[in-house]
């Protein structure tokens, strides 16, 4: 369960099966077990210390802070470990409870279906009179894409994640225990597991490599998604059969997966052509291993003795015998009367050949292979479609004999979704890399009188179009260029080699981060043409070029950029290679860091509207790629509500969303949670494509939002970019420097290693404010905007805001996110960071900045309460309200411990006794882990 989407016990509809008591019992159990472990590992005085710390922070007395200041480093670390494991255990119990609820919900009728489920959606649309043809139209173009990323603040070690899964399985065992003895056995095993966990280092000892991150991400596909996707499809088919039985024929492959892990090179020098090649080979090896196991199980199952098998199967077996005679010799006698088993043996052999070839390719890399070096396997699968054709043949032959086979249907579903690639790799690179590459190439070959980088935009466009239409190659086979330029060129050549060997699905998308102008896309098209990925002469191309607009200025300019591109005949030729579809990515993180939460949210909303208008005017299909993070400050929050809050007409059955590494465990670590997450995202896309998301007459509200956004942006930038001493304040009162020392990501936390706000990545920016409990990025500026508007005419303007909140999904979602964030802010803890960590020379400036933040927080809180008509934050969601209140009180000791350890670490003269820097750093890093577990998010 994600803290942002709490368990609603009442929603389960069964007061007996899933009561508060079952959740409470498991929480009490893990608390008791942790107390036992703490006593065993730290003695009775540690348990007493933990009780005192917890009690003192429930009522917010000063005793807790005084106690922390007296603790030795050794005792501090023990307390930190206990609180950190406690939060992780609570998270596990809540996640387990949510899984039980979803299992129970699956057995209910449409009357009690979970909101956001397929059953609930189709029942709702039936009551609203939505016609079958309208739903069919959406289903025919339904295209949901979920893209996994490696998160620079994915703080939990894979070793610890494995322990989490084991404890979940033990909770399952406890549910199934029938006797006291069985329950006691589970308790004993769980106690042992927690004790081993206590002695396991929670900190990464070495920075993970990119391929380590690849293996970590692929785990979710292997262990969960491979089985979850067929379940989601079968649930959609089941619900369509209930409400629109004729539409199951309209259902294609509606959900696919992508990944940036191993292919996102923006700001990560560790990702190069060879790494991306190895990533593709690793993904293929894992998906082939899954298929081989599935086919082996099918061969065990399909023991049908057929003296007269279907003619199509006989013809296929005769061809197989000619191609793979050794398989026939091995199995023809054993499976003499079992043609399905014999056919599956041929399929297994081809899969094994495919796997062997893949292993060979992984070793030899992406360089162009000469013919004599090619492996001698003739009978491997060149594409997943070949395997699918054989599986479809088996299904058809079985149907002619009146036999159905669910495992075969499941395997077909899996091959249709995951192919031989598992997840498509999106390559991402900063726009300046392509500019630098063409500048160097054109200078080396003397193609421009003026250096390319010095050309204005119009001159660039003219030169790029001319070069794209020139038949001669631009770049020589041998690369006499700098290492950076050579790597950029090799990336495109590697993509071409990947597509040739694996099919275009493996690497079909090239994202240009920090896109600002039309030439940014044409530069990539030119480099793609040089690698054989685009040919304007024949109108063929296999690489989709995707601009990523990130700052507010770039979001505002995006419609103009697309207008320019769509007006170019050469670019329209490129679009025909992709069924006239343009994908556009919008960045939530950098726009938020640039302009604050309200302005970022609103500018992304506007950009979608204006981009859609440009696309419609030019007859271009549009797919918007939402670069959402895991936290509110980076566009996070419940996906269902977020999709329904998009502007009318911008979804149209298609959406692409990033799933950040930090939320993968909460969404995809358990089968039921993964299946339901995919189901709700898909249901939301269907709903947003069929039903209007903006109320009639909302145009005036959009004008109002623009006014509020402008004020909020000015207020935010006055603090973050214009307030004297703010950067020093940020560096002092957050653990930003210590976060950069966590060995948790292959990617640096800053671009190019600079130490200014512009170079700091949005993710550690959010992570730092979350740790010190300000959560500044998710609300600052909103209060001034709302308060100023309300004060102009309180009765009229507040009534307007309340109407917007009740009737406009976008505004309601925005305010709800802020309300939840405000509940998480703990200004008392934040004030302690200021008190403990500001140097004397910064005290006056820092106190002024803190006063600005505190005043804005109070303004924001009062305005949100007035708009929602709540007396307290989250008054309409008691489970979430209670959960956050409890977590706030329990996280507080970790915040005080962190500030104290940071003080000792940074200021040697403030240490009560002499500690080594490494000891203090380790303690501080452990608090970062603990707070992240308690807050349930990082960046």
Curated annotation (Swiss-Prot):
InterPro entries: PEP_COase (IPR021135), PEP_COase_bac/pln-type (IPR022805), PEP_COase_Lys_AS (IPR018129), PEPCASE_His_AS (IPR033129), Pyrv/PenolPyrv_kinase-like_dom (IPR015813). It comes from Gloeobacter violaceus (strain ATCC 29082 / PCC 7421). It catalyses: oxaloacetate + phosphate = phosphoenolpyruvate + hydrogencarbonate. Forms oxaloacetate, a four-carbon dicarboxylic acid source for the tricarboxylic acid cycle. GO terms for biological process: carbon fixation; oxaloacetate metabolic process; tricarboxylic acid cycle. HAMAP family: PEPcase_type1. One of its GO terms (molecular function) is magnesium ion binding. Belongs to the PEPCase type 1 family. SUPFAM superfamilies: Phosphoenolpyruvate/pyruvate domain (SSF51621). Keywords: Carbon dioxide fixation, Lyase, Magnesium. Transmembrane segments: none annotated. PANTHER family: PHOSPHOENOLPYRUVATE CARBOXYLASE. GO terms for cellular component: cytosol. The keyword Magnesium applies. Its EC number is 4.1.1.31. This is Phosphoenolpyruvate carboxylase. Signal peptide: none annotated. The keyword Magnesium applies.
